[in-house]
Amino acid sequence: GNIHAREYMTAQLCMAQIESYLKNYNGSVKGVKVKNVLNKMAVHYIPMANPDGTTISQFGISKIRDKKLRKALYKMSGASHTATWKANARGVDLNRNSNSHFKANHGGKRGSEGFSGTSAASEPETKAIAGLLKQLKNNKTLKGVVNYHAMGSIVFGSGGSGKVKKETQKMYRLARKITGYASGDSYGSSSGPSVGSMRDYVMEKIKSPCITLEIGVAGCPLPISQFSSIWRKNESLVLREAKLLL
């Protein structure tokens, strides 16, 4: 969750899911016996993939402790309205920085959103996510990935090939059934893959099924009033996706 800074309600959702699954380990969540799933499959979370960017979105550039970063940030596009910041503290959009369909310096200049970076996986956050995915893949324990963004109340499940495509479609159909979210697969289909997309990287380079859910319906940052509805639709989602992939 929270690869885009202003989408920090996804981190709140991930933490609430973790708490629910642990609290109900000997019971059930929405009819799913938690122990029966977690005794067979580990679920790895990255609740907040972009902590520095989230600090900017929540509290402003002044709360970034590194003096050089602060100085550079004040000169970037979006510095005057940091609540809607998406990038990390180096002005790189982490969902354009993965080593999949990457284009250097795509999106103009460093700023609040859209800039892909000078090279693929140039950012420490991107490296950390890729490192965990590779480790799990090498251990033959990676069965699937759920990617949380905001907003739109839609699910993305297109792309991939062979078994990855088949398993992704299974995850996608289940996610739509659980949440009632609309299909996002028509978005961007005519323009081809996105530059440096994390989901494309997971499916094409890591060779793992992956879906993306966009939570909420208001502009980001999502208002806290939306969380109860998001929670009702998503509490059991990761647990049920894990059960599906057993």
Give the residues covered by each predicted segment.
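His/Asp/Glu-rich mid-to-C-terminal helical/loop segments that flank catalytic regions of hydrolases
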Residues: 222-246
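Active-site/substrate-binding loop(s) of hydrolase catalytic cores
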Residues: 8-12, 16-161, 212-219
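Catalytic cores of processing enzymes, dominated by hydrolases/peptidases
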Residues: 154-219
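MPN/JAMM (Mov34/JAB) isopeptidase/deubiquitinase module and associated MPN-bearing subunits/adaptors
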Residues: 97-98, 203-204, 237-243
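Short beta-strand element of the alpha/beta-hydrolase
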Residues: 1-4, 146
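Generic recognition of short, well-ordered alpha-helical segments
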Residues: 9-13, 166, 225
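Soluble or luminal CAZymes and related metallo-dependent hydrolases
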Residues: 117-128, 167, 226-233
